[in-house]
Amino acid sequence: LKNGIAKEYLFEGSYKMSQLDWQVENVILVGFDLDFELKNLYFGCNFSYGLYNFDGKMEDYDWLNMLSSDYTHYSCHNLSLSKDLDFSIDIGLMFPLEETGKNYVNLFAQYNFKNTMFEAKNGYYRYKEYGKISEGELSGLVITYNPIIESFLLGFGGNFYISKTFSFKSETAISLLSRGVCTDNHLLTKDIWKDAVFGKVFLKSKLEFAFDFGDRFSMIFGGNVENLPMLQGQTYINGYPSRNNTGGFSSFFYDFYFSYRIRIF
């Protein structure tokens, strides 16, 4: 199950004009891990896909009055995910701590690719302009948001056996570079906003516990935490670069999972 929030920003210079909070709750994920070891060298890939989002909402804030810190426009919508893909490839080195090689520390490099499609539907709005307040309800698909982010990371970790059948594994990685393209489609105004964003600090951590059943089978319970601070870059409006605006993206997600591991050889 996956939970968390992605935030979309629009700036004019250093002034924040807009922020959209895309909040997901209890997304069901399916996926797999494949790992191959050759002595102390290993290769791995991970794939996950979001099947269903039980609950979620999107909140849209605008600050159109630069003389006030209060937001002038607000809307709230139901959120659903039509796509949530996460793929990574690892290459690393293991350093055994004893003869069996079951206890080890490791260093690795990783490429990570994410492609998510958020959809905001129905909801209501409350706008304040020139001292007047207008309110109303919205129906149907209002906004879609598609951040596509790729990151290059370096990390370290280790695997440690507490008993003959019970072990835990921990890994932490930080990005050297993150970049992406985030596309916002406002269906009511028929405007498409696209941000080409860049940044460096992306932190990922994983902790999992494994129960072995013989030499080849394990049951695993684990969790991941990912924190991506602000990525920022050029904004394009309906295909044309904006002279005054820049866009931004940030996210924080965590998930818990059960899996079954089979060692083939």
Where do the model's predicted regions map?
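Extracellular/periplasm-exposed beta-strand and loop segments of Gram-negative cell-envelope proteins
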Residues: 3-27, 49-87, 113-149, 175-206, ...
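A structural/positional concept
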Residues: 82-90, 104, 156
